[in-house]
From Swiss-Prot:
PANTHER family: T CELL RECEPTOR ALPHA VARIABLE 8-4, T-CELL RECEPTOR ALPHA CHAIN V REGION
Signal peptide as annotated in the record: 1-20
UniProt superkingdom: Eukaryota
InterPro entries: Ig-like_dom (IPR007110), Ig-like_dom_sf (IPR036179), Ig-like_fold (IPR013783), Ig_V-set (IPR013106), TCR_variable_region (IPR051287)
Glycosylation sites recorded in the entry for this protein: N43
Assembly notes: Alpha-beta TR is a heterodimer composed of an alpha and beta chain; disulfide-linked. The alpha-beta TR is associated with the transmembrane signaling CD3 coreceptor proteins to form the TR-CD3 (TcR or TCR). The assembly of alpha-beta TR heterodimers with CD3 occurs in the endoplasmic reticulum where a single alpha-beta TR heterodimer associates with one CD3D-CD3E heterodimer, one CD3G-CD3E heterodimer and one CD247 homodimer forming a stable octameric structure. CD3D-CD3E and CD3G-CD3E heterodimers preferentially associate with TR alpha and TR beta chains, respectively.
Protein name as it appears in the record: T cell receptor alpha variable 8-4
Organism this protein belongs to: Homo sapiens (Human)
Length: 113
């Protein structure tokens, strides 16, 4: 069983009081069996078209960009087999990986800009 830490974050960005954006990650700890599907949930709120990001922080390392959505295809493929699907109607950008590996044990962060 590997443990994926998903810090519960609510990040709010405001520019000049006219654009408010936030992300919410559900669940603070996610345990996944090796070989099982990984699903990390991220919902966002934005008054403008969002740019969405997933970052990972492995033990004793800095943040690393996994993938980003900037307005192209709704399914975004990232590094190490991770992908996320932008769903505007559900205001979601959930991170998935078909098969978890022990090396995936880390902290994952969703962000909006």
């Amino acid at each position: 069983m590997l443990l994926l830490l998903v810090p519960v974050l609510e990040v709010i960005f405001t520019l000049g009081g006219t654009r408010a954006q936030s992300v919410t990650q559900l669940g603070s700890h996610v345990s996944v069996s090796e070989g099982a599907l990984v699903l990390l949930r991220c919902n966002y709120s934005s008054s403008v078209p969002p740019y969405l990001f997933w970052y990972v922080q492995y033990p004793n390392q800095g943040l690393q960009l996994l993938l980003k959505y900037t307005s192209a295809a709704t399914l975004v493929k990232g590094i190490n087999g991770f992908e996320a699907e932008f769903k505007k109607s559900e205001t979601s950008f959930h991170l998935t990986k078909p098969s978890a590996h022990m090396s995936d044990a880390a902290e994952y962060f969703c962000a909006v800009s």
